A protein has these predicted regions:
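C-terminal amphipathic alpha-helical interaction region
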Residues: 215-218
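P-loop NTPase motor domains
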Residues: 1-208, 212, 265-269, 274-280
């Protein structure tokens, strides 16, 4: 619940961009993100999400956090955690007075409490309930291998949470490089793909960069996600295209705008061989790791 910085909205902001990228203040940006976050975690209705927004505003007000707050003076422990949010929701539900008029109903409050219980105080709270405790972030790696064994909504919510931390560094602080390996993990959450796409468009203004990596292009060409993923291939300045595997050559060429003669350079599996593109320039490269880097890789992960 610590408000993240999503960069400043400007005239170049895409009208189709996620809501946080179009808001002005840091708090309004983060509350807009949290609505998408809760929608990712549970399929809340619009009325439930609007209720969550009202309750979040009440929660931040209790902690003295407003649109004019100076976040440079704040420590992670100055912000609420998920259990604080659940306590507020439960309090609103328990003290609901049917004789008064509210913007939300008692039933909606009950549904919200049930929906966020596991995340805030239940079995899944260990992933979400706590203050940001990262102190040394000059080089940071989020290991998400264990997420593959969780349910889809928990995985999507956790990846979305990591994405908010990365966006804060890329667009808020700047001069940061974020590398997202195994990008296919995000494909079950199309909202996250939109966030990544919009961050990629804005990072250059903050002297930041985004690196995307994935092994199988097939995952990105599924009809239900193709509309969202195709822009991800056109935004990067540099492309390293390796052997694409067992895929329809035309699909690959259309998605990455590769000419047939360029595809011919990488259509066979040759370790380390790739087509490098930058603007109008094309190079056939042989990528080799020097001995000292090869040692860093260790013995895990294939040969």
């Amino acid at each position: 619940l610590e408000p993240k910085d999503w960069g400043q909205a400007d005239s170049e902001t895409d009208s189709k961009a996620p809501e946080p990228f179009k808001r002005v203040t840091r708090l309004s940006q983060h509350i807009a993100f949290l609505k998408d976050f809760f929608r990712t975690y549970k399929n809340f209705t619009d009325a439930q999400l609007d209720t969550i927004e009202i309750l979040l505003m009440k929660l931040y007000a209790r902690f003295g956090i407003t649109d004019t707050t100076d976040y440079r003076q704040k420590k992670p422990t100055d912000f609420p955690v998920m259990s604080d949010f659940y306590d507020l929701c439960e309090e609103e539900f328990m003290t609901y007075d049917k004789k008064r008029k509210y913007l939300y109903t008692e039933e909606i409050l009950q549904e919200v409490c049930l929906g966020i219980h596991s995340m805030c105080v239940g079995s899944e709270s260990k992933y979400f309930n706590g203050h940001t405790n990262i102190t040394d972030d000059s080089f940071l790696c989020f290991g998400v291998k264990g997420l593959l064994d969780t349910n889809r909504r928990l995985k999507d919510a956790m990846l979305f949470n990591i994405l908010s931390y990365m966006s804060n560094k890329l667009l808020g602080e700047g001069n940061t490089v974020a590398s997202i390996d195994e990008l296919y993990l995000f494909l079950s959450n199309l909202t996250a793909i939109e966030y990544i796409r919009n961050a990629m468009k804005r990072v250059r203004k903050k002297d930041s960069a985004v690196i995307l990596a994935s092994q199988n292009i097939d995952d990105f060409l599924i009809p239900s996600v193709k509309e969202y993923t195709k822009p991800l291939f056109s935004i990067p300045t540099h492309h390293f295209l390796f052997f694409p595997g067992n895929i329809n050559p035309k699909d690959f060429q259309d998605a990455l705008m590769v000419e047939p003669n360029e595809y011919g350079l990488i259509k066979f599996a040759e370790r380390g061989t790739c087509l490098y593109r930058c603007g109008n320039e094309r190079y056939l490269l042989l990528v080799q790791a020097p001995d000292y880097k090869a040692e860093i890789f260790g013995s895990a992960g294939g040969r």
